[in-house]
């Protein structure tokens, strides 16, 4: 299987980094330093190369260094035997992508440099609201499917225009008959989104269940898709009979923008009945399964980004994560204290010390390489 790795990361005015050039190493990389040193910011920048979007923030404006009006993220990657330069520039709500010096649409970035991120906030996949889980679905599916990303963009545009019209009708500036062409577009695009989400979760579900079973034993974990509407026919009917409700609400009340998914343990909702340790294990099982799914789909192992996760896992769950790391071409892990990590992980890793706003400093390499 071809290897995937990031060879060099350059940042200008990104988060706490005014200017950074970091020559990364293949294999395992442990980034250690005190809180607020910028460890998570580095992972965020690496993840930005996958989708031109942050896994922490919805607004690119929030990624700017204080006082700056633009930022740049540049990555020199090695993928499928080729060297690829990815450069993303942001200024005044506009993004520009160049690949090997050529201007490209942002959607062309998808699938070139896939990553899997695992951090403390991922517990929101169980504890948070449906919007958080939809954001996860959209981000992860888009990474391997450009058509899904296009459909999602179209759906959001159609939804926005339809909601404007609903509010105009409520204010007496529009007629209900004007909704019909928007309904047709909404149904067609929404169908494609729902079908892909269902397919993705159906592919992931048995992998997640098997991974959790290996880690936790007897409990049966299920991953269940809960679409905003049961079928296309039901959705079309609701749009017709529920128009008055939608006009009064000034928004579209049914569709994939109301989708959700859930986890159950032995038939019980995990978000309510699972312990904190079980919830961490569920999220870990999801991430492990996702990495293996993308390895099969894209024929390359995604780069793994692990943000201070080992301290929250027991020995059995650490073992499952170490097994995944053993098969990774490249992984980046953060911690405040190297001594908190398993010794066998430290021995196989490059250790990078980080101080706020500075470039990581290599302090040691894998034992095998010395």
Swiss-Prot record:
Disulfide cysteine pairs (residue numbers): none
Binding residue positions for ATP: 33-40
Signal peptide, first to last residue: none
Chief place where the protein resides: cytoplasm
Gene3D superfamilies associated with the record: P-loop containing nucleotide triphosphate hydrolases, RecF/RecN/SMC, N-terminal domain
Keywords: ATP-binding, Cytoplasm, DNA damage, DNA repair, DNA replication, DNA-binding, Nucleotide-binding, SOS response
Key word ATP-binding present: yes
GO cellular component entries: cytoplasm
Location in or out of the cell: Cytoplasm
Xref: PROSITE patterns: RECF_1, RECF_2
Domain of life of the native organism: Bacteria
Pfam families named among the record's database cross-references: SMC_N
GO annotation (BP), single: DNA replication
GO molecular function, one term: ATP binding
Matches recorded under InterPro entries: DNA-binding_RecF, DNA-binding_RecF_CS, P-loop_NTPase, RecF/RecN/SMC_N, RecF_2
NCBIfam families: recf
UniProt similarity note: Belongs to the RecF family.
Protein function: The RecF protein is involved in DNA metabolism; it is required for DNA replication and normal SOS inducibility. RecF binds preferentially to single-stranded, linear DNA. It also seems to bind ATP.
Protein name per Swiss-Prot or TrEMBL: DNA replication and repair protein RecF
